[in-house]
Amino acid sequence: MAIPSFSMCHKPELLKEGKSEGQEEEGLSYEFQEMLDSLPKERGRRNRYLYLFQGFRCQAKEIQAITSFQKHFQSLPDDVVLATIPKSGTTWLKALTFTILTRHRFDPVSSSSSDHPLLTSNPHDLVPFFEYKLYANGNVPDLSGLASPRTFATHVPFGALKDSVENPSVKVVYLCRNPFDTFISMWHYINNITSESVSAVLLDEAFDLYCRGLLIGFGPFWEHMLGYWRESLKRPEKVLFLKYEDLKEDIETNLKKLASFLGLPFTEEEEQKGVVKAIADLCSFENLKKLEVNKSSKLIQNYENRFLFRKGEVSDLVNYLSPSQVERLSALVDDKLAGSGLTFRLS
């Protein structure tokens, strides 16, 4: 089956009435709400709370899903987990990884036919999120129907993931993007998915929240990046750390690196046949953006697939940020990443 098949087998009793002061989402269990009320919290965009959970900030519904995931997920030796912070190339990484892992079933060289799943399914359907799909709303999915190697995705920091992927054979691939372009992409995305009845988030407001680690969950972004970066240095056979800008500059070299890390290196025959280039072309931003499934379908609610594809460029910051904003974020990044060895190119 092209699209992963799973079923939901349990959902806890929900709290429908009499919400406490801190509850902003419906559908939270009594037990979970009690835990949530004990967490430190700060107001982020549109006055929505971000709760401090296991050392990072997250919205209530995300914490509910992460809690279910941590309690119930059982890894298998050949599992692959793709990790990103939001708006840093997640859709692209899913497409690339799925195509590499399934290339012997679905030939990317002959992908002009309608047989390849990427032509009819969004990458997020092919590689499901732990927190937004599988364990959303406290669900406990039956994953027995997933083909091997099972491939999942997450935005959670490594500290919240590590116990669930401690099996030495489980592979983790992390993709990050320079913080400037990540912010611009996130700002556009937030406004795209916001109801038309609600005013847009102004850039200056969003930028201030971003620099304070309050624009999106799973951060602050620098701690998210550093968690995976340090683990990749400590255990390079376990965690592969990739940069969006490097993939844009030399996709074929990075595809080979990714395939080798996953234990499925390209053969000389495949390279001569043009398999590497075919995967790069099939999964390119331009190709994915023009597919009907990515223009007209929806993930959930207001999350239309087309909002996942804006520009896919490097250094878009020059079109939006003032010199003082660039200076502020540059100083923040330099300070937070100092001594780590992690650096970014802006072009």
From Swiss-Prot:
Enzyme's top EC category: transferase
InterPro entries per the UniProt record, alphabetical: P-loop_NTPase, Sulfotransferase_dom
Location relative to the cell: Cytoplasm
GO MF terms held by the record: sulfotransferase activity
Major location (coarse): cytoplasm
Superkingdom, natural source: Eukaryota
Catalytic site: 155 (proton acceptor)
EC number(s) given by UniProt: 2.8.2.-
Binding site for 3'-phosphoadenylyl sulfate: 87-92, 177, 185, 244, 310-312
Keywords: Cytoplasm, Transferase
GO cellular component: cytoplasm
Job description of the protein: Sulfotransferase that utilizes 3'-phospho-5'-adenylyl sulfate (PAPS) as sulfonate donor. Not active with 11-hydroxyjasmonate or 12-hydroxyjasmonate.
Family as reported in the entry's similarity comment: Belongs to the sulfotransferase 1 family.
Protein name: Cytosolic sulfotransferase 14
Encoding gene (name): SOT14
